[in-house]
Curated annotation (Swiss-Prot):
The gene is CP31B. It is found in: Plastid, Chloroplast. Residues 113-191, 207-285 form the RRM domain. This is RNA-binding protein CP31B, chloroplastic. Coiled coil: none annotated. It comes from Arabidopsis thaliana (Mouse-ear cress). One of its GO terms (biological process) is mRNA processing. Disruption phenotype: No visible phenotype under normal growth conditions, but mutant plants exhibit multiple specific editing defects in chloroplast transcripts.
Length: 289
């Protein structure tokens, strides 16, 4: 008499371990089948199962590679193992292709497409900056610079567009663009590993103006625009803290002649700027020790 016995038929179920991103298999439940003998038949191929692994990552900064797992749990145990080692002609693939260290794989955007973005509101982070510049094209890299000690934005950052044309469009669109009451300064970033040579500043003390009690969000560009209404501004600079990059609340403006200095002082000394009465007077030349 034919007896019914439990013949464990192993179905391979693809599973992933999120902590190590590995694939492994476990047996399925027992299937009832007929057999003449009272023994358990385990049918497992001794041939290795090839799992093709590949990972796809996009050239992004400050993000980890995206790992996409594709698994299939159809009746693999009922299908024959293929000649290539796959089960029933079905393979489990995890696509993994990293960019090599020398940049081969995904082309780097041109350096000319990297932009400096200054006078950022302090609550704008890298994601918000990227979303803003996407109006001009594809943003490859977006980075707001933070103070390492306070973890606060230093009020500037960098955006790399996909092409030089998109970078030029972004400069045209966003330079002097107002965000949360602040006008952005957008221009080409200096090439990697180099800095533009600064011309030595020659000040005539008679034409140099001290500006005090400035609002904290006033930068050099805004200071220049304020004084340009009263003459030709040769140079304008808000003094910043070396450690934090924040304004120290005062700066200096150099006009082109003495008459413009007098006009600017008369017009702006004591004027209200964002609720603060600014102090404007002739800068005193420091005695060098």
């Amino acid at each position: 008499m034919t007896s019914s016995v439990l013949t464990p038929s192993l179905k391979l179920l693809a599973m992933t371990n999120s902590s190590s991103s590995t694939l492994f298999c476990i047996p399925s439940i027992f299937n009832i089948s007929s057999s003449e003998s009272h023994r358990f038949n385990f049918s497992l191929s001794s041939r290795p199962v090839n799992l093709t692994l590949s990972l796809k990552s996009k050239t992004l900064r400050n993000s980890s590679p995206v790992v996409t797992f594709v698994s299939q749990t159809s009746n693999w145990a009922e299908e024959e193992e293929g000649e290539d080692g796959s089960i029933g002609g079905t393979s489990v693939t995890v696509d993994e292709s990293f960019e090599s260290e020398d940049g081969v794989g995904f082309p780097e955007p041109p350096e000319e497409a990297k932009l400096f973005v200054g006078n950022l509101p302090y609550d704008v982070d890298s994601q918000a900056l990227a979303m803003l510049f996407e109006q001009a094209g594809t943003v490859e890299i977006s980075e707001v610079i933070y103070n390492r000690d306070t973890d606060q934005s230093r009020g500037f950052g960098f955006v790399t567009m996909s092409t030089v044309e998109e970078a030029e469009k972004a400069v045209e669109k966003f330079n002097s663009f107002e965000v949360n009451g602040r006008r952005l300064t957008v221009n080409r970033a200096a090439p990697r590993g180099s800095r533009p040579e600064r011309q030595p500043r020659v000040y005539d003390a008679a034409f140099r103006i001290y500006v005090g009690n400035l609002p904290w969000d006033v930068d050099s560009g805004r200071l220049e625009r304020l004084f340009s209404e009263h003459g030709k501004v040769v140079d304008a600079r808000v003094v910043s803290d070396r450690e934090t990059g924040r304004s120290r609340g005062f700066g200096f403006v150099q006009m082109s002649n003495e008459n413009e200095v007098n006009v600017a002082i008369a017009a702006l000394d004591g004027q209200n700027l964002e609720g603060r009465a600014i102090k404007v007077n002739v800068a005193e030349e420091r005695t060098r020790r």
